[in-house]
Protein backbone atom coordinates (compact mmCIF):
# COMPACT_ATOMS: atom_id res chain seq x y z
CA UNK A 1 0.00 0.00 0.00
CA UNK A 2 1.20 3.49 -0.79
CA UNK A 3 1.81 5.30 2.46
CA UNK A 4 2.44 8.61 0.68
CA UNK A 5 -0.83 8.46 -1.25
CA UNK A 6 -2.96 7.78 1.84
CA UNK A 7 -1.90 10.93 3.70
CA UNK A 8 -4.40 13.79 3.39
CA UNK A 9 -3.10 17.19 2.26
CA UNK A 10 -4.03 20.15 4.45
CA UNK A 11 -5.17 23.21 2.49
CA UNK A 12 -3.85 26.38 4.20
CA UNK A 13 -6.05 29.46 4.53
CA UNK A 14 -5.77 31.74 1.53
CA UNK A 15 -5.44 28.81 -0.90
CA UNK A 16 -8.34 27.89 -3.20
CA UNK A 17 -8.47 24.33 -4.53
CA UNK A 18 -10.76 23.01 -7.27
CA UNK A 19 -11.05 19.80 -9.29
CA UNK A 20 -12.94 19.44 -12.56
CA UNK A 21 -12.56 16.32 -14.75
CA UNK A 22 -9.28 15.50 -12.95
CA UNK A 23 -7.84 18.92 -13.82
CA UNK A 24 -6.63 20.39 -10.53
CA UNK A 25 -6.42 24.17 -10.10
CA UNK A 26 -4.74 25.66 -7.04
CA UNK A 27 -4.83 29.43 -6.42
CA UNK A 28 -2.89 31.15 -3.69
CA UNK A 29 -1.12 34.36 -2.73
CA UNK A 30 1.94 33.52 -4.89
CA UNK A 31 0.04 32.53 -8.05
CA UNK A 32 -2.05 29.86 -9.77
CA UNK A 33 -1.13 26.34 -10.90
CA UNK A 34 -3.17 23.97 -13.07
CA UNK A 35 -2.34 20.35 -13.82
CA UNK A 36 -4.18 17.39 -15.34
CA UNK A 37 -3.94 14.00 -13.62
CA UNK A 38 -4.77 10.39 -14.52
CA UNK A 39 -8.56 9.99 -14.73
CA UNK A 40 -8.50 6.69 -12.79
CA UNK A 41 -7.41 8.55 -9.64
CA UNK A 42 -10.12 10.20 -7.52
CA UNK A 43 -9.25 13.58 -5.99
CA UNK A 44 -11.61 15.04 -3.35
CA UNK A 45 -11.67 18.08 -1.07
CA UNK A 46 -13.28 17.35 2.31
CA UNK A 47 -13.13 19.49 5.48
CA UNK A 48 -10.12 21.51 4.31
CA UNK A 49 -8.14 18.38 3.41
CA UNK A 50 -7.43 16.90 -0.03
CA UNK A 51 -7.62 13.11 -0.34
CA UNK A 52 -6.35 11.04 -3.26
CA UNK A 53 -7.83 7.57 -3.85
CA UNK A 54 -7.11 4.80 -6.34
CA UNK A 55 -9.55 2.22 -7.77
CA UNK A 56 -7.44 -0.92 -7.22
CA UNK A 57 -4.07 -2.26 -6.04
CA UNK A 58 -2.37 -2.79 -9.41
CA UNK A 59 1.31 -1.75 -9.36
CA UNK A 60 0.74 1.06 -11.88
CA UNK A 61 -2.16 2.47 -9.85
CA UNK A 62 -0.12 2.31 -6.63
CA UNK A 63 2.68 4.27 -8.32
CA UNK A 64 0.34 6.89 -9.78
CA UNK A 65 -1.46 7.22 -6.42
CA UNK A 66 1.62 8.34 -4.49
CA UNK A 67 2.91 10.49 -7.36
CA UNK A 68 -0.41 12.30 -7.74
CA UNK A 69 -0.58 13.06 -4.03
CA UNK A 70 3.02 14.36 -4.01
CA UNK A 71 2.43 16.58 -7.06
CA UNK A 72 -0.74 18.09 -5.56
CA UNK A 73 1.10 18.71 -2.28
CA UNK A 74 3.88 20.49 -4.22
CA UNK A 75 1.27 22.64 -6.00
CA UNK A 76 -0.37 23.66 -2.71
CA UNK A 77 2.99 24.45 -1.09
CA UNK A 78 4.14 26.36 -4.19
CA UNK A 79 1.18 28.76 -4.37
CA UNK A 80 1.27 29.29 -0.59
CA UNK A 81 5.02 29.59 0.16
CA UNK A 82 6.81 29.34 -3.20
CA UNK A 83 10.05 27.53 -3.98
CA UNK A 84 13.62 28.81 -4.05
CA UNK A 85 16.88 27.33 -5.33
CA UNK A 86 20.17 29.06 -4.64
CA UNK A 87 23.23 28.68 -6.86
CA UNK A 88 26.75 29.83 -6.00
CA UNK A 89 29.44 30.78 -8.53
CA UNK A 90 32.92 29.69 -7.46
CA UNK A 91 35.91 30.87 -9.51
CA UNK A 92 37.91 33.95 -10.40
CA UNK A 93 35.92 36.21 -12.71
CA UNK A 94 32.72 34.18 -12.38
CA UNK A 95 29.89 36.64 -11.77
CA UNK A 96 26.20 37.07 -12.43
CA UNK A 97 23.90 40.04 -12.97
CA UNK A 98 20.21 40.41 -13.68
CA UNK A 99 19.46 41.69 -17.17
CA UNK A 100 15.86 42.83 -17.37
CA UNK A 101 13.93 39.81 -16.07
CA UNK A 102 16.65 37.45 -17.31
CA UNK A 103 20.17 36.71 -16.20
CA UNK A 104 23.67 37.33 -17.59
CA UNK A 105 26.45 35.12 -16.22
CA UNK A 106 30.21 35.29 -16.88
CA UNK A 107 31.61 31.76 -16.53
CA UNK A 108 35.04 32.04 -18.12
CA UNK A 109 33.85 31.55 -21.69
CA UNK A 110 34.63 34.06 -24.45
CA UNK A 111 31.02 35.26 -24.20
CA UNK A 112 28.57 35.80 -21.35
CA UNK A 113 25.92 33.12 -20.83
CA UNK A 114 22.50 34.74 -21.16
CA UNK A 115 19.41 33.17 -19.60
CA UNK A 116 16.26 34.71 -21.09
CA UNK A 117 13.17 35.57 -19.09
CA UNK A 118 11.22 32.45 -18.11
CA UNK A 119 7.50 32.87 -17.28
CA UNK A 120 6.86 31.97 -13.65
CA UNK A 121 10.52 32.34 -12.61
CA UNK A 122 12.13 35.30 -10.82
CA UNK A 123 15.91 35.72 -10.70
CA UNK A 124 17.76 37.72 -8.07
CA UNK A 125 21.52 38.11 -7.64
CA UNK A 126 23.32 38.73 -4.37
CA UNK A 127 26.98 39.87 -4.22
CA UNK A 128 27.57 38.95 -7.92
CA UNK A 129 28.18 35.29 -7.01
CA UNK A 130 24.88 34.05 -5.55
CA UNK A 131 21.83 33.47 -7.76
CA UNK A 132 18.37 32.96 -6.25
CA UNK A 133 15.72 31.31 -8.45
CA UNK A 134 12.16 31.75 -7.16
CA UNK A 135 8.85 30.41 -8.46
CA UNK A 136 5.64 28.59 -7.58
CA UNK A 137 6.22 25.45 -9.65
CA UNK A 138 8.76 23.16 -7.94
CA UNK A 139 9.60 21.22 -11.10
CA UNK A 140 10.28 24.37 -13.14
CA UNK A 141 12.44 26.00 -10.43
CA UNK A 142 14.55 22.84 -10.14
CA UNK A 143 14.88 22.44 -13.91
CA UNK A 144 15.99 26.06 -14.43
CA UNK A 145 18.56 25.69 -11.63
CA UNK A 146 19.85 22.45 -13.17
CA UNK A 147 20.11 24.08 -16.62
CA UNK A 148 22.15 26.98 -15.21
CA UNK A 149 24.40 24.58 -13.25
CA UNK A 150 24.97 22.55 -16.44
CA UNK A 151 26.56 25.60 -18.13
CA UNK A 152 29.68 25.06 -15.97
CA UNK A 153 29.36 22.22 -13.42
CA UNK A 154 31.82 22.27 -10.51
CA UNK A 155 35.10 20.48 -11.19
CA UNK A 156 36.60 18.20 -8.54
CA UNK A 157 40.13 19.68 -8.31
CA UNK A 158 39.56 23.33 -7.36
CA UNK A 159 35.76 23.27 -7.05
CA UNK A 160 35.31 25.98 -9.70
CA UNK A 161 31.95 26.24 -11.41
CA UNK A 162 28.26 26.70 -10.65
CA UNK A 163 27.04 24.72 -7.65
CA UNK A 164 23.93 24.53 -5.51
CA UNK A 165 24.35 26.43 -2.23
CA UNK A 166 23.84 23.27 -0.16
CA UNK A 167 25.89 21.00 -2.46
CA UNK A 168 29.15 19.46 -1.28
CA UNK A 169 31.73 18.86 -4.02
CA UNK A 170 33.92 15.80 -3.56
CA UNK A 171 37.45 17.02 -4.11
CA UNK A 172 40.28 15.07 -5.72
CA UNK A 173 43.95 15.38 -5.01
CA UNK A 174 46.04 16.87 -7.81
CA UNK A 175 48.88 14.96 -9.44
CA UNK A 176 52.00 14.48 -7.38
CA UNK A 177 55.20 15.86 -8.87
UniProtKB/Swiss-Prot annotation:
Pfam families reported in the protein's UniProt record? Ribosomal_L6
- Enumerate the UniProt keywords alphabetically: Ribonucleoprotein, Ribosomal protein, RNA-binding, rRNA-binding
Is the keyword Metal-binding in the record?
A: no
Location of region: Disordered: 151-177
Concerning SUPFAM superfamilies, the annotation shows: Ribosomal protein L6 (SSF56053)
Where are the compositionally biased (Basic and acidic residues) regions? Answer: 152-177
Q: Name one GO cellular component term.
A: cytosolic large ribosomal subunit
Q: Which family does it belong to?
A: Belongs to the universal ribosomal protein uL6 family.
Protein function: This protein binds to the 23S rRNA, and is important in its secondary structure. It is located near the subunit interface in the base of the L7/L12 stalk, and near the tRNA binding site of the peptidyltransferase center.
The protein here is known as Large ribosomal subunit protein uL6
Lineage per the UniProt record: Bacteria, Fusobacteriati, Fusobacteriota, Fusobacteriia, Fusobacteriales
Amino acid sequence: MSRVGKKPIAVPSGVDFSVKDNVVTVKGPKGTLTKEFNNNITIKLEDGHITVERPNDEPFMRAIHGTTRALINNMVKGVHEGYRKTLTLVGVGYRAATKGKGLEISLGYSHPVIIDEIPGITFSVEKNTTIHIDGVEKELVGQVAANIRAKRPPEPYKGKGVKYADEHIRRKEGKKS
